[in-house]
Every structure is written in C-alpha cells, then in structure tokens.
A protein has these predicted regions:
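Generic structural signal for short, flexible, solvent-exposed coil/loop and linker residues
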Residues: 2, 21, 25, 52, ...
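Primarily NTPase-proximal linker/entry elements flanking Walker-type ATP/GTP-binding cores
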Residues: 3-124, 131-167, 171-176
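Acidic active-site catalytic centers that drive phospho-/nucleotidyl reactions
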Residues: 35, 125, 177, 215, ...
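Short hydrophobic/aromatic residue motifs in ordered secondary structure
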Residues: 38-40, 128, 244, 272
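Short glycine/serine/threonine-rich phosphate/pyrophosphate-binding segments
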Residues: 100-105, 129-131, 221-223, 247-250
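Conserved catalytic-core segment of NTP-binding enzymes
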Residues: 155-168, 184-289
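Short glycine-rich anion-binding loops that position phosphate/pyrophosphate groups of nucleotides
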Residues: 179-181
Length: 290
C-alpha cells in the first residue's frame, strides 16, 4: 500500500521531537517522493524552514499551513466554459496511456450535461485505428456525436470538418482527441502544429484551448511530457487523471511551479462521471492532510 505524503508528514512529526534541520531534510525527501520534484522541494523547504524559525513555529499544523502558504501560488484553476453561440475548439493532448481518449468522452458528457449546445468529439488520432473505434464507442455510450475519418487520414482535416459542422449549427464545442506517440516526437510535433493552425483558424476568438491530459501517478515523467507539449504548441490547461490523494499527486505543484499551467479538471476513476472541476484548495489540503 502506498503511503500518502500527508501520512509521511504525520510520521515525521511522530519521529522528530523538534522542528529542526533533520526534520526539514526528511520533509524534502517526502516532497520529492510525493512528485513535487527535487528543485521545487528544495526551494519550498528552504523557505518553509526560514519562516518557521522566524515565527518560532513548533506545531505540526502550523508547519503544514506554512507549506500551504508557499504551495498555493503554484496551484491554479482555469475554468473552461464554452461560450454560447460561438465555435469553441478544445484540442486534447497527451501521450498514449494517460487516459486521453476516455477523458475526451468524460469532458464531452460533462459539457453535454451542463447545457453546452452541439458538442462534437473529433477523432484526430488517425494514427491508431483503435483510437478512432474507441472514440466512436464512447460516442454511442454518451450520446455525443463523433466526427471521424479513415485510419491514416490527415488529423487536421478531421478537426476542420468537426469545426465546420459546429459552426454550421450556430456554434458549439469540438473536443479533439489527438495522437500521443512521443517516441516519434518530431513527427508528432509537426502533426500537432498543423492541427493547431487549423483549430486556431476555425475557432472563434478566445474560444480555442489546448488541454494536456497527464497521469497523476507518473510523477516527473508528467512534468517532462508537459514541457514537450508546451514547447510544441503551448498548453492552456491540465486535466489530471488517475488521481488518488492517498498516493503521490504532487505533480500539479511541479507543473504549476515550472510552467505556470493551471488545472481545469481532475479524474478519479474510469467512469464517465469520475471527472470534476479542479479545486486548488481541496487539492492542497488533501495533499498535505489538512
């Protein structure tokens, strides 16, 4: 069973009689193991130690509140809400295996239930026939229309057709699934940049967003993935999948600190309903055990 960061902190307080340098060394290790990342962990602990000395802090909760104070600026929320009577395009990015296609379906159902008119899922991962089929199955189950071409087709043309369809119906939302073969990085980047140009042209002003899906259990790999996609096309928002507050989960802090990308949604399970609007305060409190 994985021990949460919050439990590790409680164990630290049980083991150490004083809030001293040895305590802060172990706090650094716990943050790194919690996927906050070494650089961010060292910076946070250095600042926390100085504040605790200055304020003469000796209680567990006070130390955690200092950490919360320091972490809060790095963890931000972005509201992704399509505008009525406008064409919105949300390009959903991520490596294979993070739950990207399922996340597209979860988001589509979320928007359908919240009253977004004319939502469409675009099967723009044309590299994998299985991805197209998977999205079509999700479409049948959620009642959300899917625009798809044959396997091997130009992904940008799929997004173009989906956006044209939405536009012809007076506006709505295109959620575009995309390829994630990071092992073939150069080809993938070129493909995404082409889709990016088309999506930007077809969406109404201010209605185009690039959303990166990351697996909350993959730690610093997720940060490296975010760096690649952010450099390629720019990322506006994160969806954190496979999130389990009892395990690691600190990667949103690392991405926020290093890249400044906010989080829109958090997914806690496989079901279509297992998606929620991200709440930074709840996330930080769960991470720290407050």
């Amino acid at each position: 069973m994985k021990i949460s960061f919050a439990q590790k902190i409680k164990n630290l307080f049980g083991f150490h009689k004083a809030i001293d340098s040895a305590f802060f060394d172990e706090l650094t290790d716990a943050l790194i193991e919690g996927d906050v990342g070494a650089k961010t962990a060292f910076e946070l602990v250095e600042k926390a130690e100085a504040i605790c000395k200055e304020r003469k802090i000796s209680e567990e909760k006070e130390v955690l509140l200092v950490l919360k104070e320091l972490i809060t600026p790095y963890v931000n929320f972005i509201s992704l809400q399509p505008e009525k009577d406008k064409t919105s395009v949300y390009l959903v990015l991520g490596v294979n295996g993070v739950g990207k296609t399922t996340t597209v379906a979860k988001m589509a159902l979320h928007y359908k239930k919240s009253g977004t008119q004319n939502s469409i899922m675009a099967a723009a991962d044309t590299f994998r026939a299985a991805a197209i089929e998977q999205l079509q199955i999700h479409g049948e189950r959620t009642g959300v229309r899917v625009v798809a071409h044959q396997s091997g087709a130009d992904p940008a043309s799929v997004v173009f057709d989906a956006a044209e369809s939405v536009k012809s119906h007076g506006g709505g939302l295109v959620l575009a699934d995309t390829a994630g073969r990071l092992h073939n990085k150069e080809n993938l980047v070129r493909e995404l940049q082409k889709i990016d140009r088309i999506a930007k042209q077809k969406a109404d002003e201010g209605c185009y967003k690039k959303i990166l899906v990351i697996d909350g259990t993959t730690g610093q790999n997720a940060l490296r993935q975010a760096e690649v996609f952010h450099e390629a096309v720019g990322v506006d928002a994160i969806v954190l999948t496979k999130y389990d507050s009892t395990a690691k989960g600190g990667v949103a802090i690392a991405i926020g600190k290093e890249l400044g990308i906010p989080v829109a949604f958090i997914c806690t399970g496989e079901g279509y309903k297992d998606i929620g609007v991200f709440n930074p305060d709840t996330y930080i409190n769960e991470f720290l055990g407050l």
